[in-house]
Swiss-Prot record:
Gene: PTHLH
Assigned keywords, A-Z: Calcium, Cleavage on pair of basic residues, Cytoplasm, Hormone, Nucleus, Secreted, Signal
Protein name per UniProt: Parathyroid hormone-related protein
Native species: Ovis aries (Sheep)
Annotated region (Disordered), positions in chain: 61-121
Family named by the database record: Belongs to the parathyroid hormone family.
Cysteine pairings via disulfide bonds: none
Propeptide feature ranges: 15-24
Cell compartments where the protein resides: Secreted; Cytoplasm; Nucleus
A Gene Ontology cellular-component term: cytoplasm
Entry-linked InterPro entries: PTH-rel, PTH/PTH-rel
GO BP of this protein: bone mineralization
Length: 121
């Protein structure tokens, strides 16, 4: 035990153990900082790429119509096409009741009374 305490308090290579610990903590925090910085740069590049891609998608329809007939009227932004999701039965049943023939029966409310106690032990 005495040798351990002496070796622990004696500086190694001119540096104390506390200084080495601080250096290690600083290295870890610098590594984390660089990692976070790289992550934010990557996120910024991804956002820029998606923004550029979305801008191309929004202008693709205008470009396509202008290439086909340059003198014609541009297509309106709003379309009156009916959009359908799902089937006609969608609003009739709850998801748990799909394909059930029985109708819903109300169950009697429980009256407040004795509560079950857990088993001791």
């Amino acid at each position: 035990v005495g040798v351990f305490l002496l070796s622990y308090s004696v500086p190694s290579c001119g540096r104390s153990v506390e200084e080495l610990g601080r250096r290690l903590k600083r290295a870890v925090s610098e590594h984390q900082l660089l990692h976070d910085k790289g992550k934010s740069i990557q996120d910024l590049r991804r956002r820029f790429f998606l923004h550029h891609l979305i801008a191309e998608i929004h202008t693709a329809e205008i470009r396509a119509t202008s290439e086909v007939s340059p003198n014609s009227k541009p297509a309106p932004n709003t379309k009156n096409h009916p959009v359908r999701f799902g089937s006609d039965d969608e609003g009739k049943y709850l998801t748990q009741e799909t394909n059930k023939v029985e109708t819903y029966k109300e169950q009697p409310l429980k009256t407040p009374g004795k509560k079950k106690k857990g088993k001791p032990g």
